[in-house]
């Protein structure tokens, strides 16, 4: 049965080792864009690995295009986050103070003192936020990540499909999406108004990867941080493997086996198969970046509300700051380490 359904089975350690020694490494745009979300240490570790395998790196034209188009969007989103956090903090501060005002006649709540503590806590957080923003690298003006990738990937980007082939791919893509054939169909709602190039971007990447394997007669290790089920087989919330349909389609088209990893797993496997020494802390950070689609300030603010409505504890200011900083999301870590970046 294994010979008939190889897409459902893991490779042996021997076969896997062979792939890592011979295959081409292909990176999706989301992996390249996530480099902006890593701390300097994690980013350097990733670049060290890219340098080691640079002679076997290749990326699709579509992935390179998406990186170029979205690079400034990602950079700007990080800058805009400071503004968004300030607006959210200001809104919640007003709501908390309004709530306290409704208890002015409460016999035990010292609302005036509580309001002073709240004011002090929010002012302290605002000052910290200002300091972090001032230290944040201005990648809009000077982008060393872009420059480094431009050198590293020179001559390693595939050609685009001709217009006629793209038009056919769009027609085939619509049918695939309607039938929920991976990859990409999960983008239907999100990207339906962004034009065919964006809507069918995952399929373009996929077909360009297949064509590359046909031309060079070598298999591919594809690294993507896409989390959706049109790339990954999931069971009861747990990611089991890449979609078997993708592995089968690749084999049917190329007679070869494709291996697909998310960035953190790629680093783990490189430690095992390429004698890399990426630390567990870096791998965990890369994993956190993949899992954190956006900086979730709302959760911290809700916790702040609960804390402020408690009983006027003398340590409220420090506790409030702790709550805001305790969740080590990827974006927070990127901000926190921005001063380290400027000193390099």
Give residue ranges: language-model regions.
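Active-site-proximal, substrate-binding regions of enzyme catalytic domains
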Residues: 2-220, 227-312, 316, 325, ...
